[in-house]
């Protein structure tokens, strides 16, 4: 089977979630089966393995609906895309598309960094289910990253095609000495559904803990969060390398998130892989990902988050959570996910 993997959503500077998913799967899949990568920018190769590649047009260009005409030149049997928007008109190959989450149907605010016209289209697209159905039913099969999202796809009848769960995994973070510190770590965006406000309020109830916010944050959002709970000890990293992120996690009391919705939850796996406990909102996908390793709190219960963090002051509880975390994280590997994906791609 001649496989082509759409790598055009890989970033040129540093990974985001979909970029990391693509690179992780491609690297592991190449260990199992020959493949060719589709790229749209040579700079993407910085974050991809050294494999055969073919350059085509950008996935955000006006010609995307017709990109299959370029892909046909490779004479592939199957093409896998880590998104659901890959153009398919005129294709002469099997196509597998991916849905990562359905967050924006329930939380309609688009990413703030999109241009205004794209934001308008984003809102319009997520006002109804039928555009998603049209996209997915063009494929021969659909992939998603969690059982929770697969269930939602079924609930809303988003496709007539078979749906396969190919989970995310976490790239190994740099290991090193871990000196225990009263430090809470949040890795994620500051979009409203992420509910960072609840973490800030919880931090105000934990005066002996710092809350480290690792991601880039707009100046206005930083000021708003600081004013929300002036007594909270907030540390804004405004972006962090893998090394800085790992250093923050090692020895931290917990990774925390009060998100109301996710497709998976990669930061949970990253933290658990280092033996760092996770204190997270009680939503189905976090129960799926962390299982018995997690501590779960109502997303609006700041006092509940504070109590769950204080429970980790008990050395025995902290040790048990750390051991359970490492064991749970070990179940998520790119090798396992690639094997699942390869089975799908070679049996269409």
Regions found by a protein language model. Give the residues of each.
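Carbohydrate transferase catalytic cores enriched for Leloir-type hexosyltransferases
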Residues: 1-348
């Amino acid at each position: 089977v001649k496989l082509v993997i759409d790598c055009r959503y890989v970033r040129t500077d540093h990974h985001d979630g979909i970029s990391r998913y693509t690179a992780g799967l491609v690297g592991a899949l190449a260990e199992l089966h020959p493949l060719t990568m589709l790229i749209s920018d040579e700079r993407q190769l910085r974050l991809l393995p050294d494999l055969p590649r073919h350059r085509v047009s950008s996935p955000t260009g006006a010609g995307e609906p017709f990109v299959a005409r370029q892909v046909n030149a490779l004479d592939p049997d199957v093409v896998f895309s880590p998104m659901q928007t890959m153009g398919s008109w005129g294709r002469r190959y099997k196509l597998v598309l991916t849905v990562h989450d359905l967050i924006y149907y329930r939380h309609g605010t688009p990413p703030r960094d999109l241009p205004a016209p794209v934001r308008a289209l984003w809102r319009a697209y997520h006002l109804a289910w039928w555009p998603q159905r049209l996209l997915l039913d063009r494929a021969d099969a659909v992939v998603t990253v969690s059982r929770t999202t697969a269930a939602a796809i079924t609930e809303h009848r988003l496709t007539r095609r078979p749906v396969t769960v190919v989970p995310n995994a976490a790239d190994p973070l740099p290991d090193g000495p871990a000196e225990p510190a009263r430090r809470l770590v949040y890795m994620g965006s500051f979009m409203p559904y992420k509910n960072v406000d609840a973490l800030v309020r919880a931090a105000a109830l934990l005066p002996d803990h710092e809350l480290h916010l690792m991601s880039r944050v707009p100046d206005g959002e930083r000021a708003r969060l600081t004013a929300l709970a002036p007594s909270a000890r907030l540390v804004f990293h405004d972006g962090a390398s893998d090394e800085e992120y790992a250093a923050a996690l090692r020895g931290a009391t917990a990774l925390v998130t009060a998100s109301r919705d996710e497709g998976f939850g990669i930061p949970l796996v990253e933290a658990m892989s280092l033996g760092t406990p996770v204190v997270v909102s009680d939503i189905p996908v976090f129960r799926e990902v962390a299982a018995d390793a997690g501590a779960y709190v109502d997303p609006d219960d700041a006092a509940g988050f504070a109590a769950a963090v204080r429970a980790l002051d008990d050395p025995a509880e902290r040790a048990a959570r750390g051991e359970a975390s490492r064991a749970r994280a070990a179940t998520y590997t790119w090798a396992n996910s690639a094997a699942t994906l390869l089975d799908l791609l070679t049996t269409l």
